[in-house]
């Protein structure tokens, strides 16, 4: 079924592109004769949308070389008429990103340092409006208040641009085509909100309909923006889309090689499953497109989301998608379009990234049930499979370890056949060719599958237990992904204890199964289980330590 839905998603996307092509080829002659006026007037409503877009890129203390490569890639991106860069930080260490921006775009560019992040303005304004309504004993209309807050933020952004006397777009000598915004350090959601508000104002000046949103470690290809927009432009009911992703640092370490196969196989198939019905539940942060008309009504509630009494900053991508779906907008996945992102180079960093993504998934999947009442049932099916499968696996393995009985029947031949079908399909149809010659890259596929699925139950369960833990986002290279300091002491990362414990449980359960299969005695089985747990546990500890 997954393969069929993946193919259906590509077919539906291609049909939208064909519809767009038909709209573009339609005659643009306004009036042939007087009696054709009404016909032309109706055709205007169905005319081809403008495909130009602007791009918004956000980051915090990114590696300078990688950031420069990412910014430079937009100079070749088809259809990108304006680039907005958001830097989350205004301290001395944050100036390097601004310098990189100025180096990448020395002409027709400008930098604005904001006195206050617009997210804080929105929060304060909303609290004031709510207090005024309560003081006057008036009912609180949440949507109306959010609308007023959004209008205030947009007006403030307009005022800031006017104060700096920037000539946005155009062909004049002073025209600005790249703008860098710098604000006090908050979190990724904070700089995204500021960038989105300014994007609405700039897009209105330029007359563009679409916004590409990305991260400071993502490199786009010449057709990444244009082909993603092509997949939604002809359908006015679709508010967002995301493209596929490849890993541009796949050859750096063993971890990055393994992670690249996960993007190749897992991402391509799982994201396509629900996207065939325009109900994709997550627009990837590095490669998302939004219809700008969909953003004003969702940005304030998205930014001010509260879960269990706590403001959420970890689930910016998924919650933005959820808000679009709740407002009736479709969200699709352009699986045949690619952009290149960065992946952590160490096991410790990779597990932390997986934890953050898993927490965001749980919040949106389990705590926002209204979305399933307004969307295709396929979205609920995808959620149930994703949320309960790893939990069941963790319970079943632990249950076997404690009782020597199987909780659920497992067919190894069935699992093997599913893996072979998935691998074979990806080799044939996946637009990502893994970057190198066939065998050199594909020999990592099976290890990559194990690399992903072995820790998955532990990541899934632990992220549920630590649901509201915070973090800026995926760790920037400048914050720990650079080479370690020589001769620095090795210290354990105690927040990886969940992974070490899970590997011990898994090793003990596997040893117990082998002992039963080969008819070991009780003492031999116990010794084998203990030895396996110690060896695997020590290995798991070793691969999660870092240099300080």
Segments predicted by a language model, with ranges:
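Transmembrane alpha-helices and immediately adjacent membrane-cytoplasm interface residues
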Residues: 2-12
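Residue-level recognition of hydrophobic positions within alpha-helical transmembrane segments
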Residues: 3, 262, 287, 312-313, ...
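Membrane-embedded multi-pass helical conduit in multi-pass membrane proteins
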Residues: 4, 385-471, 501-548
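Interhelical loop segments of eukaryotic multi-pass membrane proteins
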Residues: 10-30, 413-421, 470-480, 526
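Non-transmembrane catalytic domains and loops of membrane-associated enzymes and transporters
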Residues: 18-384, 388-389
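Loop-to-transmembrane boundary segments
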Residues: 56, 373-389, 481-505
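Membrane-interface alpha-helices
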Residues: 91, 465-491
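Short, surface-exposed, charge-dense and proline/glycine-enriched linear segments
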Residues: 114-118, 270-278, 363-373, 394-408, ...
